[in-house]
Amino acid sequence: PRATQKRLKDHNSGRLLLEKCVENWGLPLDSIEVLRTEHRAPYLSWISGVWRNEPLPGISIGHCEGWAVCALVEPGYWIGIDAEKKNRQIQSNAFEMMAKGEELNFLIENSKMAIKIWTAKEAVQKAEKLGMHLNPRDINLDNYKVESFIHDDLFVSVSWRKAGEN
């Protein structure tokens, strides 16, 4: 199936932002490519034929209604980033898809926190390099490093952890 115009635009804007971030990191753009894991998580790699073995930073890219967000982290760590419009309302019927037990009860009583929990869990899914193969209901945010903040009209969450640790 062909990608929609919107999807292509999101992809391209994310890649342009990633290029800027990689350039600001001080890496040569002509020697690096973006590859994907089996779960479609992006990562940087030296282009075949470039004889460098220094580790590359971990990366994550996200999109939201015309915005692109990107995060880089020092080698040896995994990172995930997610963003949503800060005024986006998560419908209460979606709460059971993203939380259970005490967390679900908290969400029901504090529905304004839903966007923070939603973006935090999406960031964790990306940092774990498992994407949607990690059920958000099974993510206990207390077990992860997550920072959330507002930038313009976006609510952004970033999660990171040591690569390969369980």
Q: Regions from the language model: what does each represent?
A:
Residues 1-166:
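Core catalytic alpha/beta fold that binds nucleotide/phospho-ligands
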